[in-house]
Amino acid sequence: MAPNATTKKRAAAKDDDFVLTLSDDENDVLENGVEEDTLSSSKKRKRDAAEAPKGKNKKQKQLKKSKKGESAAGAVSDDQSGEEDEAEAMDAGEDDGALDSEFEFDVGGNANTGVIEGFDGWEARNGAGPADAPKNGDKKAVDIDDIISRRKAKKEAELKKKQQKEKKRREEEGEEESEDEDADSDGGMSVDFQDDELLAADGFGMGADGADESGDDVENDSNDSDDADEKGSEDEESDDDAAASDNDSVATPVHHPDDEAASDEESEAESEVDAEEAEKRKAFFAPEEKSTAASTSNRSFQDFNLSRPILRGLASVNFTTPTPIQQKTIPVALLGKDIVGSAVTGSGKTAAFVVPILERLLFRPRKVPTSRVAILMPTRELAVQCYNVATKLATHTDITFCQLVGGFSLREQENILKKRPDVIIATPGRFIDHMRNSPSFTVDTLEILVLDEADRMLEDGFADELNEILTTIPQSRQTMLFSATMTDSVDKLIRVGLNRPVRLMVDSKKNTSMNLTQEFVRLRPGREDKRLGYLLYLCNEIYTGRVIVFFRQKREAHRVRIVFGLLGLKAAELHGSMSQEQRIKSVENFREGKVAFLLATDLASRGLDIKGVETVINYEAPQSHEIYLHRVGRTARAGRSGRACTIAAEPDRKIVKSAVKAGKAQGAKIVSRVVDPAVADEWAAKAKGLEDEIEEVLQEEKLEKQMAQAEMQVTKGENMIKHEAEIMSRPKRTWFETERDKRAARKLGATELNGPSKKDKVKLSNKDKKRLDDARQRHEGNIGWKKGKADREAPKQGKNKGSKNKSDKKNNIKMKGKK
């Protein structure tokens, strides 16, 4: 007992000698901490308050380190806070993973923001993850607008300098010459006025023609919209004009002989296939329930018996009434059945499969984190959009998400995969990359597989990648396939491994939205080269904002982007040659209204949901009617109205015919837009006058890309020197295909979108390259031409004698050799 008493006395003496010195700020911190401790009554408040004293204790420790003996006091406070944290952790463990009704998980960061008005899947991303900031290393994007603005500034400076010189020269001439000569100099200035008058007259004529044309178009549209079902009356009205023979409708009732022959062949082929295919479908698909059709009318999300967090998530994005595809899909998906679903574009197919997935995941075991769902998309933009929609709907749950798409950091995605997120949203290529090369990613636990835009995923371009995924993931899974143009081919669907799937075809006839007006502008034979003039007229005079223009080729989209920039039209481009950061920036700029036109390839034709798209213009008709439906489906979504305008030439006759036929059967509005050929020729001439400047911009862009590539190579070399050991220790990433197989797959994918190429591209030999280079140099410089036949037959007299002597000598040498 004596030693204990002595130690207590010593400790008391030390405490008496120790004097606490606290500043005014630290007193305030302590008082606030006491008030927060008294307010924490529930478990949630205790958890929130537990983090605040920790931070304040750390701050106190940093401020007290300079004082003697303060470390001991800091240690005591840390021990006390540690004991409180352990006690709270034990209290939290008593729930055994159950959800508290008062507890709110805020994964997306918008739990308390209320209803999100006009949510379109491209809202600002608040949650952490790869969607926030794409990691592309040190790649520098080349901005076309910067190049064009620099060139304009340079031209303006040169013009200003030239004008100053001209003004100075005129002033000098005015001092030296007489008044008559001054009058002559004024006459010389009239040339500039004439030039200005020419420009003004040109602009005035254009404005007058455009106004008249727009008025005619409005009248034509109104007449056509009133009589959309009877196209013949439109043609009779247009015949009254003098130029009606050149500008009549594409949807003319006079059938082309090739069209009639093709339709007969197609009908015979369809009748033969239908019988066999019907038997296959009857054996493959599960029988449809007839009772569901009557019960799906006037239902709400509450009728599906969804959990409260899911209903709150739906209300937060202003989803109140389920669409027809959602009414059919959600009850069947909750039962765990395989689904093949189809509906028109903009009908809510994403929510149709996300909602039942979230509902099923709410009842998952929580002790061990496990990835249970994989959603595969054909494009990066669609995957990013689906990720945003899913995180918004799951705001009030504890379900975690991960997106695996190209263009983002592999390391960050691997770190997220280590946490085993519940739902993985990916493109096939990056999914296979992580499946083969990320040790923390396992697919053995997947229970649900979703293929969005499934008909595109089943095409030849994705066939090898899809087979690699399907043979790796478990066979005992729920599989759901969705698309606006879903295929019924049993042979293709068998590859996915479906087990008696349920067909949910809300739109089995591949129709467009009823609020969509389809327009067609016909190019007569021989006017295909004026296509750009028609596009510029439409974008300058008719459709001036919120327009998506679709192209078949990336090269054409990029070139038209430069033309738009030179003509002062604000536009952005979207295609596969851009980096992921550029692609997301283009979509965001268009969504926010910073640019009026989005020039895109078929990369953006599927699934992209941007609010307020008023018009879709097809620069060329697509390869198939299915692609046409996806393109025009970017507008007139979710009950809104929109227009689709297609510039069609003779090669596009088949697609236009099928679109008009489907539209008439549906009762959709089909309009023929008449454009004055003279106006289109003027715009085409303007575009042709910019060809030299376009080539200069392309050359400057090429040089900037080469500079950026060189800088990247230098940075790569520096990193190899600095971090050689770490880089060489990494395992080499593998792929299931060779480079030759990759090229073949890309070729098949291009063929699906653009049709077979007219001639196969073959790598040129060095001899062929040299021959082509020589021909190009001769053509450009008019040098190095060989003598023609006339020059060889009529040479000069002196050269003729010399040639005879040389020939005689050669003959003599030959004769001597024979002797």
Swiss-Prot record:
It catalyses: ATP + H2O = ADP + phosphate + H(+). PROSITE patterns: DEAD_ATP_HELICASE (PS00039), HELICASE_ATP_BIND_1 (PS51192), HELICASE_CTER (PS51194), Q_MOTIF (PS51195). Its main location: nucleus. Residues 1-299, 732-819 are annotated as: Disordered. A motif (DEAD box) lies at residues 452-455. It is found in: Nucleus, Nucleolus. GO terms for molecular function: ATP binding; ATP hydrolysis activity; RNA binding; RNA helicase activity. InterPro entries: DEAD/DEAH_box_helicase_dom (IPR011545), DEAD_box_RNA_helicase (IPR050079), Helicase_ATP-bd (IPR014001), Helicase_C-like (IPR001650), P-loop_NTPase (IPR027417), RNA-helicase_DEAD-box_CS (IPR000629), RNA_helicase_DEAD_Q_motif (IPR014014). Residues 55-67 have a biased composition (Basic residues). CDD domains: DEADc_DDX27, SF2_C_DEAD. Pfam families: DEAD, Helicase_C. Residues 531-678 form the Helicase C-terminal domain. One of its GO terms (cellular component) is nucleolus. It comes from the Eukaryota. Residues 23-38, 80-105, 173-185, 210-243, 260-277 have a biased composition (Acidic residues). Residues 330-504 form the Helicase ATP-binding domain. Residues 135-161, 278-291, 732-742, 757-781 have a biased composition (Basic and acidic residues). GO terms for biological process: ribosomal large subunit assembly; rRNA processing. Keywords: ATP-binding, Helicase, Hydrolase, Nucleotide-binding, Nucleus, Ribosome biogenesis, RNA-binding. ATP-binding RNA helicase involved in ribosome assembly. The Q motif is unique to and characteristic of the DEAD box family of RNA helicases and controls ATP binding and hydrolysis. Belongs to the DEAD box helicase family. DDX27/DRS1 subfamily. This is ATP-dependent RNA helicase drs1.
